[in-house]
Design a protein with these regions (language model features):
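Single-stranded RNA-binding regions, centering on S1/OB-family and related RNA-binding modules
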Residues: 23-29, 68-78, 82, 172, ...
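Charge-lined substrate channels and their catalytic hotspots, especially those that engage the 3′ end
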Residues: 1-174, 183-228, 260, 267-268, ...
Length: 637
């Protein structure tokens, strides 16, 4: 157990409080095994031994983690709180090293390639799908590129788009998506496989990554690095001029990426041309197809939530949190998102049609009680007269209905309120061996295929696809075993999500602890019976104004309206309202940022200036990132 030292010089050593804010008791800790006496604010690993009385335990310190003001120490603490594995066992590393050795000696299976000199020489989709796929297609003539963040190290997807002359099947666009063939290296039942299953996914923090696979694989053999031959599982999907998929084919292959592009570089090329656009002229075709796919997805009702995404700036030498900013979402991000969504859907449709067991990614329709609360709350806003709010008894609104509500609120004072309420009505997306819709994407059939380096569910989908194509003999998981694997993936995804939220709160506390007494503007981001949360305009960090700080009034809580109403003064606080607050104190051990109200405005604050340029999985490239920082939401579908 990790604890904070809150007082030294007790009878046994020091008095501590658990660093996990869910635990509420004190420990009298023996620190005789430590090399030096711990300081107040230091974090220790402690073994609890016996309960002395209510709220007090005895324990013995095993090791000091460091001072709480160090961001890296806070990351380590968060990892402990959520049982996130760190170092790989020696036998797993040995197995990975053997794969690297075999690849270096040329033992990796790159033989028997079917020739494909250039993309123009590619077989028509219908012929590829009927051809034998037990051997790899040579796709090194296709000008694939990877597009990722500037600090990405593992590249698991590469793309290429081209326009087609009028094809008899109606396809006028051709999307190629090549995904690292992790299943070639990580075999079922191997030590690497068991370790990857236990981890479930990679875990990303502002200054570190705990990968699902050893770096020999994640950043080496499997990573689609430029100018190196890499094994892939490829998808080729043809679309008509409305963005409707008409054809698809899947096959194992080998590619040679033509470039390691960044989102920022691609956006510059799309906006202004230049040298990169000259080297990769098909980027404009990719942009056009992405717009087409986005428009079609929105037309069917897919939900997008434009929420702020934090990027912490940490000095890795000192551990100091130097700042925080909202990530800017570019169309280049959305371009990759649309292509990954299209590939995921195409694979899910194919495997479903073939009757192959695999883990679906499902997102159930919203809970009826949550929807009822949502519609009652919206009925108290300026949207009250909208026909969209007419809901028959027992009716579940379609994704397109909820999307229309979001669109109608765009640019109004209710935009923030409506966006938050719709998001809170959503269920949790999860993996399941049983087919089901993805409500947030308005997709009847969906899976995760595009990130097998960092999500175990994707690796299972790759094995199912390879088996169905006859490229591998199996076995693949089915029945109860597939259910157990899906449940494990769900559990580890939840751990990753909770850890992400916790480290954001911890680093937010570190950033604010030296700014007590300062005044901030913000917006009410949550309302409870004991106070309301405020998200700062300056940074995506929340604090709380407790009702106990008001000495001149008594407040009643209206859950339907998400509102607090002053009994004596009539003063109101509701979701989305603009306020000015003063930071009174910060308790990092309890993850508390305490505020007092300074002033309000009468209307809800518009959120368009507070948010990133796009949205994502209330739906989600789910859980997993490709860089040392927060995973972009477009990676989470």
């Amino acid at each position: 157990m990790a604890v904070h030292v809150t007082r030294n010089q007790t009878q046994r050593g020091v008095l501590c409080r658990p660093a996990d804010p869910r635990l509420d008791f004190l420990l009298d800790v023996d620190v005789s095994a430590l090399k030096a006496a711990p300081k107040i604010g230091e974090l220790l690993l402690v073994t609890p031994e016996e309960k002395v009385e209510d709220g007090l335990w005895r324990g013995t310190a095993r090791v000091s983690l460091g001072l709480e003001e160090d961001a890296m120490v806070q990351e380590r603490l968060t990892q402990l709180n959520h049982e996130i594995p760190l170092d790989f066992p020696p036998n797993v590393l040995a197995e990975a090293a053997e794969l690297e050795k075999r690849a270096a000696e040329g033992a990796a299976d790159l033989g028997g390639l079917k020739p494909l000199g250039s993309v123009e020489d590619a077989l028509p989709i219908d012929r590829v799908s009927k051809a034998s796929t037990s051997k790899r297609q040579d796709l090194r003539g296709v000008p694939f590129v990877t597009i990722d963040g500037e600090d990405a190290r593992d590249f698991d997807d590469a793309v290429y788009v081209r326009r087609l002359p009028g094809a008899p099947d109606g396809a006028v666009w051709e999307l190629w998506v090549a995904i690292a063939d992790v299943s070639h290296f990580v075999l079922p039942g191997s030590r690497l496989d068991r370790e990857a299953r236990d981890r479930g996914n990679s875990y990303y923090f502002p200054t570190s990554v705990e990968p699902m696979l050893p770096e020999v694989l994640s950043n080496g053999l499997c990573s689609l690095r430029p100018d190196e031959d890499r094994l892939v599982m490829a998808a080729r999907v043809g679309f008509d001029d409305r963005g409707i998929p008409r054809t698809s084919a899947f096959f194992p292959g080998v590619i040679r990426s033509r470039g390691r592009l960044t989102y920022e570089g691609v956006q510059e090329a799309l906006d202004h041309g230049g040298e990169l656009a000259g080297r990769h002229p098909y980027l404009k075709d990719a942009e056009a197809l992405a717009h087409l796919l986005l428009e079609r997805r929105q037309a069917r009702g897919s939900l997008d939530f434009d929420l702020p995404e934090a990027q912490f700036i940490v000095n890795r030498s000192t551990g100091e949190v130097e700042g925080i900013k909202r990530r800017v979402r570019l169309f280049a991000h959305r371009l990759i998102e649309e292509f990954m969504l299209a590939a995921n859907e195409a694979v899910a449709r194919f495997l479903t049609a073939k009757g192959t067991p695999f883990p679906y990614r499902i997102h159930p329709a919203p809970d009826p009680d949550r929807l009822s609360t949502l519609f009652r709350t919206l009925a108290s806003t300026d949207l009250a007269q909208s026909d969209l709010l007419t809901l028959k008894r027992g009716e579940t609104p379609s994704p397109s209905r909820l999307r229309d509500i979001l669109v109608q609120a765009n640019g109004t004072p209710q935009e923030y309120l409506v966006g938050r309420l719709v998001l809170r009505s959503m269920m949790q997306a999860r993996y399941s061996p049983e087919a089901g819709e993805h409500f947030g994407l308005a997709s009847p059939c969906y899976c995760h295929f595009t990130s097998p380096i960092r999500r175990y569910a994707d690796l299972l989908v790759h094995r199912a696809l390879s088996f169905t194509l006859g490229a591998t003999p199996g076995p693949i998981l089915a029945g109860h075993k597939l259910l157990m694997a899906a449940d494990q993936c769900n559990a580890r995804e939840r751990a990753a999500t909770e850890a992400e939220r916790e480290i954001a709160r911890r680093l937010g506390c570190l950033l604010l602890r030296e700014r007590t007494g300062e005044t901030f503007t913000g917006v009410v981001s949550g309302v409870t019976e004991f106070g309301f949360f405020v998200e700062f305009d300056e940074m995506p960090v929340e604090g709380m104004v407790r009702l106990t700080t008001f000495r001149d009034d008594w407040f009643e809580y209206d859950p339907d309206r998400q509102e607090l109403i002053g009994v004596g003064t009539g003063r109101r606080f509701r979701l989305g309202q603009a306020v000015t607050v003063r930071l009174t104190d910060v308790h990092i051990g309890r993850l508390e940022v305490n505020l007092e109200l300074e002033g309000t405005t009468d209307t809800a604050k518009r959120s368009s200036s507070r948010r990133s340029a796009g949205g994502r999985e209330a739906p989600g490239r789910s859980s997993g990132r490709k860089r040392n920082g927060f995973v972009p939401r477009h990676k989470r579908r």
